[in-house]
Amino acid sequence: MANLNQPPSRVTPNLLHILNAFTDSSNTIINTIVELNSNTINKYELITETGHLKLDRVGYSSLAYPFAYGCIPRTWDEDGDPLDVEIVSVTEPLIHGSIVEARIIGVMKFDDGGEVDDKVIAVLSDDKRMNHISSYEDLGEHWLKETKYYWEHYKDLKKPGTCNVNGFLG
């Protein structure tokens, strides 16, 4: 039987604080801690103090994430959280809490109810099907529209009109 009220016998390292943000000297490949997969409405978030994943919320509508999502260790955005990463064109589900190497292809400027909450756009660095993608623009016009639509409407049932995509950089 487990001793539920006993302190842990060892400390689990917090990946947010020990992993480097970049895996290479060219600063194009990032470590990304996976928080969720595409086609889910559940929003998981890393607890910054411990590095554990927590169900932050269940989506307010059936509008599911159109990409896998995670964060970059040792980074902090203006909203006080690690920098967010959209991992696009993932064909197989990733394991929540796992570390993947991703190649940066752009940034989406995002205003979430008055807070800056920009999103790094990336592809899995080892996915040979993505070798031809060097910029978010290579994903096509429909991808841009879908991503913009998702971010500008995912909170509509809770706080309509509070989220704005302010462009893409690449």
Q: Which sequence ranges carry the predicted segments?
A:
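Hydrophobic N-terminal alpha-helices or hydrophobic patches in metabolic proteins across all domains
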Residues: 1-170
